[in-house]
């Protein structure tokens, strides 16, 4: 009984994956790839602002910029991107997905903890979360005013 259920679930997942890969606009993958490459390149360049053992300003800038732009694009979707969903995916999933980095943020927090930089850790975590939410909200409001 469990094998039959598992087999049915796997077939269903495979069907959905096949549908996504082959029956959806395949150009969106190209646009996401290009957006991802550009976002990764910008993320790499911004990372030079980080210093060894210092405050990770590059990661903070990348993540806060990404939060603002994601909010802005979310609000602008109805007005500007409804006819261009592929472009929206290229920017959000590709560019912003590659630009922002939650995993690096977490690793930097662990590094600060290991080096007993508790004040810096607290400042970085609170700044990232509070300003990330705030900038995303500002982006949504600004985008709503533009649309």
Curated annotation (Swiss-Prot):
Looking at the UniProt entry, the stretches that span the membrane are 29-49, 61-81, 90-110, 118-138
Entry binding sites for Na(+): 97, 100
Pfam families noted in UniProt? CRCB (PF02537)
Task: Give the main location.
Answer: membrane
Ways its activity is controlled: Na(+) is not transported, but it plays an essential structural role and its presence is essential for fluoride channel function.
Indicate yes or no for the key word Zinc.
no
Q: Name one GO cellular component term.
A: plasma membrane
Q: Which domain of life is it from?
A: Bacteria
Q: Which UniProt keywords apply?
A: Cell membrane, Ion channel, Ion transport, Membrane, Metal-binding, Sodium, Transmembrane, Transmembrane helix, Transport
The places in or outside the cell where this protein is found are: Cell membrane
| GO biological process annotation, one example | cellular detoxification of fluoride
The reactions it catalyses are: fluoride(in) = fluoride(out)
Instruction: Spell out the molecular function terms from Gene Ontology.
Output: fluoride channel activity; metal ion binding
InterPro entries given in the database record: FluC
Q: How does it sit in the membrane?
A: Multi-pass membrane protein
Q: Which NCBIfam families match?
A: crcB (TIGR00494), PRK14201.1 (NF010797)
Family membership: Belongs to the fluoride channel Fluc/FEX (TC 1.A.43) family.
**Which function does this protein serve?**
Fluoride-specific ion channel. Important for reducing fluoride concentration in the cell, thus reducing its toxicity.
The protein in question is named: Fluoride-specific ion channel FluC 1
The record's gene field reads fluC1
């Amino acid at each position: 009984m469990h094998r039959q259920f598992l087999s049915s679930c796997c077939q269903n997942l495979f069907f959905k994956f096949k549908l996504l890969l082959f029956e959806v606009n395949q150009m969106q993958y190209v646009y996401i790839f290009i957006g991802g490459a550009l976002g990764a390149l910008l993320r790499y360049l911004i990372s030079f602002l980080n210093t060894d053992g210092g405050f990770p300003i590059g990661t903070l800038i990348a993540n806060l910029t990404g939060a603002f732009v994601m909010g802005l694009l979310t609000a602008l979707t109805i007005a500007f991107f409804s006819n261009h969903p592929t472009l929206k995916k290229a920017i959000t999933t590709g560019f912003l997905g590659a630009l922002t980095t939650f995993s690096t943020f977490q690793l930097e927090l662990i590094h600060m903890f290991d080096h007993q930089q508790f004040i810096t850790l607290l400042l970085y975590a609170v700044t990232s979360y509070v300003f990330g939410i705030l900038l995303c909200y500002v982006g949504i409001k600004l985008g709503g005013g533009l649309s």
